[in-house]
Each structure stands twice: as C-alpha cells, then as structure tokens.
Regions:
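Structural signal for interior beta-strand "rungs" in well-ordered beta-sheet cores
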Residues: 100-123
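Terminal amphipathic alpha-helical/low-complexity segments used for targeting or macromolecular assembly
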Residues: 1-105
Length: 123
C-alpha cells in the first residue's frame, strides 16, 4: 500500500489514532517526516506558477501529533512540554562540521523541528 493511501485511510479515522496506532501507520508517518526533513518531499510546492499543497503530507504531519505522547524536554536554558518527536533530532548530536555543512546559523536554545528543511540563503 502506498504511503499516500495509508495516510489518507488513517485520516478518515483520525479521532481514533493514538500512540497505540499500528506500526504500518507509524512507519508511513515517520517516512514522510524523514522525507520532509531531507527535502525529498514538500508539503507544498510551486508547479507551473501554481502552489500545490500535498494533502497527504500535511495530514501525515497532523497525524504525527496523535501517535506521539507529550514529553518533557530539558535544555540548558529552559524546559518544554511538547510533542518531542519533532523537536528531537534535527540538530541533536550534530558536530561543528555538520553545522558548517548545513550552512545555517542557529542561535542557542532555538529548536528546529525535525520535519523542517533548512537551506542556505543565497544573496
């Protein structure tokens, strides 16, 4: 079954989706989040001068909030209570070289959710 079909089928019953969701759905959501993170897919893109929203990708993001529990996150300057699955991972564990390769500056204590693609600014 395609990722799009898995997500669209789950969306029809979104009120019943919880952290106990079946693994196929979790895998589909996590794959889309990973694809967003890498830039392989986008929730919306401009095609022939028209902005097209990819509904199944938007739905996958929303469903991800239903399959992960709230968590307490502690940082050096603050703590947060949020759906941590997207806050963990974008730059967690990055080295100086990883940051330089990514090409963006990130001020201390600024979380960047995992599903966000950050690209170099071109001037």
């Amino acid at each position: 079954m395609s990722l799009e079909k898995i997500i669209n089928d789950a969306w029809e019953n979104k009120d019943q989706i919880s952290p106990n969701a079946d693994q196929e759905l979790k895998d589909a959501i996590n794959q889309i989040i990973a694809d967003l993170d890498s830039g392989a897919v986008r929730a919306a893109e401009k095609i022939n001068d028209q902005w097209i929203a990819h509904q199944h990708i938007k739905k996958a993001i929303m469903l991800s909030f239903r399959i992960y529990p709230m968590e307490n996150l502690n940082g050096p300057y603050s703590s947060w209570y949020d759906k941590a699955h997207l806050l963990k991972g974008k730059t967690a564990g990055w080295t100086k070289e990883d940051h330089e390769k990514a090409g963006f500056r990130m001020v201390p204590n600024s979380p960047v959710r995992k599903d966000h693609l950050l690209e170099r600014m071109r001037f």
